Amino acid sequence: MSSKRILMITGDFTEDYETMVPFQALMAVGHQVDAVCPGKASGDTVATAIHDFEGDQTYSEKPGHRFALNADFASTNPADYDAL
């Protein structure tokens, strides 16, 4: 598989595994993944959340990781990417 440039748009309180796992997996197979968030810059972090069913009628929410952004949203040009 040839390396692709991928843009990942995320934000505060994103589901932890829905952000961390694809980001790490895509990079592990050789893709360049730029993670951005509106209003935040490279080096900033977004809060993630872990939702868990613990026997109640709905899920509980717990703090997840601080996910570090590695690109600036403001200077991102979608035309520079192979995938979103």
PLM features: what roles do these ranges have?
Residues 1-83:
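Extended, subdomain-level signal for the structured scaffold at the beginning of enzyme domains
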